Swiss-Prot record:
MF GO annotations: GTP binding; GTPase activity; guanosine tetraphosphate binding; translation elongation factor activity
Segments forming domain tr-type G: 8-283
Organism of derivation: Pelagibacter ubique (strain HTCC1062)
Name the record gives this protein: Elongation factor G
PANTHER family registered for this protein in UniProt: RIBOSOME-RELEASING FACTOR 2, MITOCHONDRIAL, TRANSLATION ELONGATION FACTOR G-RELATED
Compartments, as annotated in UniProt: Cytoplasm
Organism phylogeny: Bacteria, Pseudomonadati, Pseudomonadota, Alphaproteobacteria, Candidatus Pelagibacterales
Family the entry assigns: Belongs to the TRAFAC class translation factor GTPase superfamily. Classic translation factor GTPase family. EF-G/EF-2 subfamily.
GO CC aspect terms: cytoplasm
Coarse class of the protein's main subcellular location: cytoplasm
Coiled coil: none
Function: Catalyzes the GTP-dependent ribosomal translocation step during translation elongation. During this step, the ribosome changes from the pre-translocational (PRE) to the post-translocational (POST) state as the newly formed A-site-bound peptidyl-tRNA and P-site-bound deacylated tRNA move to the P and E sites, respectively. Catalyzes the coordinated movement of the two tRNA molecules, the mRNA and conformational changes in the ribosome.
Length: 692
């Protein structure tokens, strides 16, 4: 498909927020008003266009990032609707990696919620400029101004309201546009498609002027000449104000705040205008850096159709009609169907069979895609999430994505022999789609173990096995994904010697193992001098260490956060080999760690409970009984919000306890925060249970 819009008229955006803040509804309204959707789909009746998986329509939450393209005011907007449930944070992470800008949706009643903070931090990590939409102002208890304060206090940014609401709750009728200084009022009978500009109501003139003054003063800081003109009493033109707001948004000086109610069809068109006016085009980003394969040399890929092709695969999905689809963001050059592209990450050539422009679950075949496009490729054999595609003549390796370690695991067993044959294929395909989902086999029991980010995550995997692959499975109880770590530094020397006629095996290794800071991972360093261990045998030692690390020593859980230094060793000209040094490395590392004392680590979750005040005492008492540590307590409207750090092992089945103690009136959310050493009595229990 030949280019229809110049690159400066592209907007690649994500819509993200906490669960139930109204992201999918907001996206539905955007598709409706931009002409892509002839009927508005509602999340609560299971008809939302973007929520196209069966599980999503049943549960009313967005699980996978659906991509769609729409058009507004002669601009092309590629939207990715991302999930707000903490178990699917990986979807947000990989979407942000390929987006230029983001819209953060907030619930006007709840304000900034835990997952709002999580996605905000993710957007900070990838330096994604953003605007906010304070949604659901039609609901009882909504408070725009309190929400703006929460954005400032909790997210550590400078909010810049460019609108304020006219009316609130049932009386919400429109917004005051602080850039135009006009009231924008919607006509209810036209499903929000029609509105008119009016004079600002008398009762809002004073507060509108206050926020307008703050807006202008913050905006003109982006332009010295305009700042001078403003200080001299000159009126700032609307187009100059828009330019200043855009500049400040792109350089992270502030975050524009819009508002309304997507469900009540108010405020969506001005949000679209803000996307066009204030979020970046690929031209504003300019380029992306990669490296030359096999070296550290930096390669700059300019966002330009005329340069070599480069793209990042950010999602793999199974489509019931097309098969495996690989979603890519094109950073430079052009790609056409029928041509070959080079997968730098795998050093393989891929052929592009079909290329599709996606609209949630419908698709349009295209022959060509260009810089800035987000498209899906069918028929790729080797490419998975995070891989780079490019021209073989101009190879580049773009920075891959980082994926979190799973915190929960369950055993799954096929119900019949027929299911057994299909289960391996099903789990393999699901793991290819979702890098935060892992599949392993327990060597002793032969069981298949699936690992993920939470109970809901694994729930949906099992559900998809059944629906999409017709695999029936028995599912075990959820287990915590513990880790092992080192308490103290330790040094040990080990000699591996085996003689059984003919060539024997000989390897001597001396290792120093040291604990490292949490989150630092694993590292192995060689300080061998004088050829005590020849270079070709060092990988054997490293492999031995890795094998023991992966399988664990204390209780069979992977080891993390340590450093190993290979200090010395000895080899034999005939009897030494890579295998001999691998076996020596394994035994030496295991003994050194045992002498250094091993400790079990457990995932600790950040839990936020929103409860009526009447039940606060019971909720806090219950969290304390779960080894929880209360971090904060605050009032939010007529509810109390309790934040606590609680070990995941003590959170299974929490929803039922919370419903029971609050008569169904309290709710909670949780996400992984960090790994922490377990108390000795818990460690003894876990190791005893595993020992059987």
């Amino acid at each position: 498909m030949a280019r229809t819009h110049t690159l400066n008229k592209y907007r690649n955006i994500g819509i993200m927020a906490h669960i139930d803040a109204g992201k999918t509804t907001t996206t539905e309204r955007i598709l409706y008003y931009t002409g892509k959707s002839h009927k508005i789909g509602e999340v609560h009746d299971g008809a939302a266009t973007m929520d196209w998986m069966e599980q999503e329509q049943e549960r009313g939450i967005t699980i996978t990032s659906a991509a769609t393209t729409c058009f507004w005011n002669d601009h092309r907007i590629n939207i990715i609707d991302t999930p707000g449930h903490v178990d699917f944070t990986i979807e947000v992470e990989r979407s942000l990696k390929v987006l230029d800008g983001a819209v953060c949706v907030f619930d006007g009643v709840a304000g900034v919620e835990p997952q709002s903070e999580t996605v905000w931090r993710q957007a900070d990590k990838y330096k994604v400029p953003r605007i906010c939409f304070v949604n659901k102002l039609d609901r009882t208890g909504a408070d725009f101004y309190r929400c703006v304060e929460m954005i400032k206090d909790r997210l550590g940014c400078k909010p810049l309201p460019i609108q304020i609401p006219i009316g609130i709750e049932a009386d919400l009728s429109g917004v005051v546009d602080l850039v135009k200084m006009k009231a924008q009022v919607w006509k209810n009978e036209a499903l929000g498609a029609e509105w008119e500009y009016k004079e600002i109501p008398d009762d809002l003139k004073e507060i509108s002027q206050k926020y307008r003054t703050e807006l202008v003063e913050m905006a003109v800081e982006q332009d010295e000449k305009l700042m001078e003109a403003y200080l001299n009493g000159e009126e700032i033109k609307e187009e100059d104000l828009v330019k200043c707001i855009r500049k400040g948004t792109l350089n992270f000086s502030f975050v524009p705040i819009t508002t309304g109610s997507a469900f009540k069809n108010k405020g969506v068109q001005p949000l679209l205008d803000a996307v066009i006016n204030y979020l970046p085009s690929p031209i504003d980003i300019g380029s992306i850096n990669g490296t030359k394969p096999g070296s550290e040399d930096v390669v700059e890929m300019k966002f330009d159709d005329g340069t070599g092709f480069s793209a990042l695969a950010f999602k793999v999905a199974n489509d019931p009609f097309v098969g495996s689809l690989t979603f890519i963001r094109i950073y430079s050059g052009t790609i056409r169907t029928g041509t070959a592209v080079y997968n730098t990450s795998k050093d393989k050539e891929e052929r592009v069979g079909r290329m599709l422009l996606m609209h949630a679950n419908s698709r349009e075949d295209i022959k060509e895609a260009n810089t800035g496009d987000i498209v899906a490729l069918a028929g790729l054999k080797y490419t998975i999430t995070g891989h780079t595609l490019c021209d073989e003549a101009n190879p580049v390796l773009l920075e891959p994505m980082e994926f979190p370690e799973p915190v929960i695991e369950i055993a799954v067993e096929p119900k019949t022999k027929a299911d057994q044959e299909k289960m391996g294929e099903a789990l393999g395909r699901l793991a290819k789609e979702d890098p935060s989902f892992r599949v392993t086999s327990d060597e002793e029991s032969g069981q298949t173990i699936i690992k993920g980010m939470g109970e809901l995550h694994l729930d949906i995997i099992v559900d998809r096995m059944k629906r999409e692959f017709n695999v029936e499975a028995n599912v075990g109880a959820p287990q915590v994904a513990y880790r092992e770590t080192l308490q103290n530094a330790s040094e040990f020397e080990y000699t591996h010697k085996k003689q059984s006629g003919g060539a024997g095996q000989f390897a001597k290794v001396k290792l120093l193992v040291e604990p490292q800071e949490p989150g630092s991972g694993r590292s192995v360093e060689s300080k061998i001098k004088g050829g005590a261990i020849p270079k070709e045998f060092i990988p054997g030692v490293e492999k031995g260490i890795e094998t023991i690390s992966d399988g664990g020593i204390l209780a069979g859980f992977p080891m993390i956060d340590y450093k190993v230094t290979i200090l010395d060793g000895l080899h034999h000209d005939v009897d030494s080999s890579v295998l001999a040094f691998e076996l020596a490395g394994r035994a030496c590392f295991k003994e050194a760690c045992t002498r250094g004392t091993l400790k079990l680590l457990e995932p600790v979750m950040r839990v936020e409970v929103v409860t009526p005040e009447d039940y606060m005492g019971d909720v806090i008492g219950d969290l304390n009984s779960r080894r929880g540590q209360i971090s904060t307590q605050e009032n939010r409207g007529n509810a109390t919000v309790i934040t606590a750090m609680v070990p995941l092992a003590n959170m299974f089945g929490y929803i039922n306890s919370l419903r029971s103690m609050s008569q169904g009136r309290a709710q909670y959310s949780m996400f992984f925060d960090h790994y922490s050493k377990v108390p000795q009595n818990v460690q003894d229990e876990v190791t005893k249970k595993i020992a059987g």
